[in-house]
Amino acid sequence: MAYVPLSGTNVRILADVPFSNDYKNTRWFTSSSNQYNWFNSKTRVYEMSKVTFQGFRENKSYISVSLRLDLLYNASYIMFQNADYGNKWFYAFVTELEYKNVGTTYVHFEIDVLQTWMFNIKFQESFIVREHVKLWNDDGTPTINTIDEGLNYGSEYDIVSVENHRPYDDMMFLVVISKSIMHGTAGEAESRLNDINASLNGMPQPLCYYIHPFYKDGKVPKTFIGDNNANLSPIVNMLTNIFSQKSAVNNIVNMYVTDYIGLKLDYKNGDKELKLDKDMFEQAGIADDKHGNVDTIFVKKIPDYETLEIDTGDKWGGFTKDQESKLMMYPYCVTEVTDFKGNHMNLKTEYIDNNKLKIQVRGSLGVSNKVAYSIQDYNAGGSLSGGDRLTASLDTSLINNNPNDIAIINDYLSAYLQGNKNSLENQKSSILFNGIVGMLGGGVSAGASAVGRSPFGLASSVTGMTSTAGNAVLDMQALQAKQADIANIPPQLTKMGGNTAFDYGNGYRGVYVIKKQLKAEYRRSLSSFFHKYGYKINRVKKPNLRTRKAYNYIQTKDCFISGDINNNDLQEIRTIFDNGITLWHTDDIGNYSVENELR
């Protein structure tokens, strides 16, 4: 219970004071003169020049007023001076009107410790639970406040923005990997065919790589290698002919489609023009003596892969800007990055250490597709720089390693002919050799019989020669029949090709940046709460007593307030701030619909 002086002068019983002793709200002043003028302007219900207060023993201080109770019904506040305190003004709440008799009413009161000692206390650094803070930075971006409020925000989001980002817009790459070189070199005939071509492709490796840029409609970009136009074949021709070429059939290890091959290429989407480094790539014509030429690109070497950056624009773009900046934070707003292939990550937009959301793309030419998408400067501390920031972004990455394979047809006849080519040639040679030897042997025998004048011997020898030749023909026919039987076996898919047709046919390429926001009803509910009570900050600091135009809410824990006042009143003031109180800077107390911008 606050200390009450024994007496008072210039006692004024007031009406229309819009706050009470629950200390949920109070009027905050910048000077004692402003404070006096504000209270003195309120309606005076009754005045007394000098009063001795009563009820101290019962801890129920009151003033005996010579007025009927019903004439005091609107009395809510008292102000008075005390000579013993240098004529200081004291302020008090009317707590009860007690009927004494027809002409006398006891007006019970208790000291308003906050108004009475407002200019006698000093805030020290204290633990601030919540208060009104600065909402927006000077550049219009929200200030960061992510402390959990423990409030219900629902279980569903509205999707407010969907953007698809691809490394090279509509262009993609068919990657063909072979065990050996499938093309010749201009001026060198076919001297390189079937050569093993060990090279640098991120690391030393023995396989050969061909790339073929194309679009969904089957067309190819105008491609230059150095200053030379590569005149690439349409993608359908490429696929049709590559399995017809003797240098390609069963030489192919894998084929897949990818959005990014690990290099920042000079590509102009508007002109559909691609420029490649002649030291890394060369035009390749794959052909044989029976089929037309297929023009594609052979990868000579790739010493190092490069990171491609996609600037998606303002990281806050797409979100509905709310009056309360905290509603732009996670979990009220979420940025999701997904490829719709089972790979996704949820981002806290505020932790992107940049005003723009930039996607870093990493890729390679491996035996299968692998492309990584990471967010630049996500959770990157201010102490990181350069390559460290780039590396740190890998901690939050979406890695698309879906095979994206193209079906490979295995022709049993081609496989048999090529895989057993030497064996077949040996069999043919053996058949012919045995037939000739047999015929020669028969001829020698016939000659001997002729010398010996044995007509029967001559006849048998001729028969033997005929039989030997016939056996050779039969053996050749059997071998050809075996080959014909194999040719009648239907071609089979040795690799089905995964979901490439579904993913690319439906346009699921690159990554999608999806922005989600709370349902409108929850945004309204939380916005009104934050507007009234500010944000949790859980920090040790001096409170913001007057940073807003209309009001400041402050709640502390074990706050530290000093002042040249009695300890009982000081402790009560500390309790008021620990419980939370709204300090009003305007006379429109209780009207939370007013604009409450920063001063």
Swiss-Prot record:
Keywords (A to Z) from UniProt: Late protein, Pore-mediated penetration of viral genome into host cell, Viral genome ejection through host cell envelope, Viral penetration into host cytoplasm, Viral short tail ejection system, Viral tail protein, Viral tail tube protein, Virion, Virus entry into host cell
Classification via Pfam families: Caud_tail_N, phi29_gp9_C
TM region positions: none
Subcellular location: Virion
Cellular compartments per GO CC: virus tail, tube
GO biological process: symbiont genome ejection through host cell envelope, short tail mechanism; symbiont genome entry into host cell via pore formation in plasma membrane
InterPro entries cross-referenced by the UniProt entry: Gp9_C, Gp9_N
Function statement: Distal (knob) tail protein that plugs the end of the tube before DNA ejection and forms a channel perforating the host membrane during ejection.
Oligomer and partners: Homohexamer; forms a hexameric tube structure with six flexible hydrophobic loops.
Similarity comment: Belongs to the picovirinae distal tube protein family.
Protein name: Tail knob protein gp9
Protein species of origin: Bacillus phage PZA
Phylogenetic lineage: Viruses, Duplodnaviria, Heunggongvirae, Uroviricota, Caudoviricetes
